[in-house]
Amino acid sequence: YISAEIAHERISGVVLFVNGPGGMITRVDVLEKLIRQSPKPIVAYITGVCASAHFWFVSACARRFVSSPMDEIGSCGVVYTFQSFKEYYAQMRIEIEDSYPDSADRKNRAYRDNEEKQDDTLIKENLSFYHHLFAQTIARNLGVKYDAQDPLFRGQTFFADTALAKGYVDAYGSLEDAILWVAAQKTVKRANKMI
């Protein structure tokens, strides 16, 4: 939908109404890039939580408004939730066995190591890769230096006042303020063309 709105000649920008704790990492980088490279302003209106995957793509917005001191922003981190149903199936007397050809011995290796050996080394390697991308993106979009020891890059969330003071969001405002900001950008763009 965002691509269609950006392409529409009568739409001057987009306001994202954000209240989300994050979620799946899949394609959040693609959404972030779309927002960052948009020729029209895309603004976030945060009301509640803007964490993890939501924080990832919102960091690319041209402006980030918060609605309340209770808004939470941040959680630059990743998590992998592993669920094993092996014991449950055993209790139900259901036997499940996976077979792999010798030529695909690396298939599902991270999952298998965790399940069979309680070794999450490969999972953590993958998570480190994702977290590095996430942290570098946040640093670039917020214009801050990446520091692995900074709580911002270690998964901490911040209430709105702190996030505002640190530059992670831009201003307090209402949904109407966000809409007016987008509309004003079109006026500024037109005025700059006239000068």
Regions found by a protein language model. Name each.
Residues 1-40, 49, 55-141, 185-195:
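Small-residue-centered hinge/linker elements
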Residues 44-51, 152-156:
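Glycine-rich beta-to-alpha transition loops that act as phosphate-gripper elements at the mouths
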Residues 64-67, 169-177:
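Short acidic-hydrophobic, aromatic-tinged amphipathic segments that line or gate anion-handling sites
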Residues 84, 158, 174-177:
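Residue-level recognition of oxygen-bearing side chains
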Residues 134-162:
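Secondary-structure end/capping motifs
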Residues 176-184:
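A ligand-binding cleft/hinge motif common to bilobed small-molecule-binding domains
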